[in-house]
A protein has these predicted regions:
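Short, Gly/Pro- and small/polar-rich lid/capping loops
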Residues: 1-16, 293-315
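Short, charged, surface-exposed loops that flank catalytic or proteolytic processing sites
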Residues: 133-139
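Short, well-structured alpha-helical segments that form the helix of a local strand-helix-strand
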Residues: 140-149, 286-290
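Long, repeat-rich segments with strong aromatic
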Residues: 241-297, 320, 327
Length: 375
């Protein structure tokens, strides 16, 4: 399996937590190499044409239904070398998908359900396998869950689905097991490369979904360290010094922006995934978070802290951010005009403007879809 190291940051905002009633899903798509040229494309709808999607990174081949909706993607230019990686977009039903936030399970759980690295679902094809065939955010979780059961997963992936009413975060952490949580309407959620979902309520299928047999899997292999709870992060995730320097500080800084009165520690391994904000969140604040680098703290690499502090934590915005996007759904507008994909392409979102792209467009501008292989 060819690997593409990815390290992203995600922010999700429910419709009652936003200043204008929008649902917002934002993510920085980061890699370890700046800069991989990307294109913005619109794939047409198709009918009566069963087909397959194939990964360039492993031996995955997935069947696609005979009919598919029009959808957007932001693929790499050099598909054979870099993989497809459509990453983010809307389909014609105004359903948003952003994939993926790389997540990492611990060795205990992977020993009993290893990743299918040879032929499982990779990030590079996960959008093409899913987005053309879903009618809602909830349906997205259900549909992708069926594909994971069928093919297995090649890697740990956090996947975002959103529509005008809901935003869901799905974490696929082992070869076949996953959990998804609906973000409450009056809350926001933050994560960065760690298993994020915490307590799972198996009696609340309206707000949680999960892979078949996951409770039995955990019980059979004695994986739950908590006698009185079922914390997905504690069971399946990691909690080490790497997390404390690379992952948790990004979550900490977001909570500092949206709840400044709360005093968290940037190295706290139990930071909350979902919280209520002390005010209604604007689009500009979501974009500012994705472009942030610990401003007004000793940890700002462009600030005035000590050299040790400035290098202590991995910032949110990077020079190796391939694209930064906010998928916004505005339910107060006519259905055909409700979706906007705000895109910052080709560099650190700290210094790159966000371009609004119409989520229901039936074609992409030639200047964006014909990116050259060398910039």
């Amino acid at each position: 399996m060819q690997t593409r190291h990815s390290s992203c940051t995600t922010i999700l905002v429910g419709k009652k937590a936003s200043i204008d009633g929008s649902v917002m899903a934002g993510r920085n798509d980061d890699t370890f190499l700046p800069l991989t040229p990307q294109r913005y494309v619109v794939y047409p709808a198709y009918h009566n044409h069963p087909n397959q999607v194939k990964s360039y990174l492993n031996h995955f081949v997935g069947d696609r239904p005979a009919d598919g909706y029009r959808y957007q993607g932001v693929p790499n230019v050099d598909l054979k070398k870099e993989g497809v990686y459509d990453e983010n977009g809307f389909n014609e039903k105004n359903v948003a998908m952003s994939a993926t936030e790389s997540v990492y399970a611990n060795e205990r759980v992977l020993a009993f359900d290893p990743l299918n690295t040879e032929s499982g679902i990779n990030e590079d094809v996960i959008v093409a396998l899913t987005l053309p065939f879903i009618d809602s955010a909830r349906h997205g979780v259900e549909y992708l869950g069926q594909q994971v059961a069928k093919y297995g997963s090649a890697e740990g992936n956090g996947v975002i689905f959103a529509d005008r009413d809901e935003v869901w975060y799905m974490e696929i952490v082992t070869g076949h097991h996953w959990v998804a949580q609906r973000i409450p309407d009056d809350c926001y959620a933050l994560t960065g490369n760690r298993v994020a979902i915490q307590e799972v309520d198996f009696g609340d299928p309206d707000n949680f979904m999960w892979s078949a047999g996951i409770q039995d899997f955990v019980a059979q292999h004695h994986l739950n360290p908590d006698p009185d709870g079922w914390n997905f992060r504690r069971i399946f995730g990691t909690a080490d010094v790497f997390d404390q320097h690379y992952n948790t500080p990004r979550q900490w800084y977001g909570h500092k922006l949206f709840n400044p009165e709360l005093k968290f520690d940037p190295m706290d391994l139990d930071l909350p995934f979902v919280m209520k904000c002390d005010h209604l969140i604007s689009l500009e604040e979501v974009q500012a978070y994705l472009g942030s680098h610990y401003q007004n703290t000793p940890y700002d690499p462009l600030g005035h802290g000590s050299e040790e502090d400035k290098r202590r934590f991995r910032p949110i915005s990077l020079n190796r951010t391939q694209n930064s996007h906010v998928l916004q759904i505005k339910p107060d507008l006519p259905e055909a005009a409700q979706t906007i994909m705000w895109m910052a392409l080709g560099g650190a979102p700290t210094f790159t403007p966000y371009l609004p792209l119409f989520g229901n467009a039936d074609q992409a501008d030639a200047r964006l879809r014909n990116t050259p292989a060398e910039l």
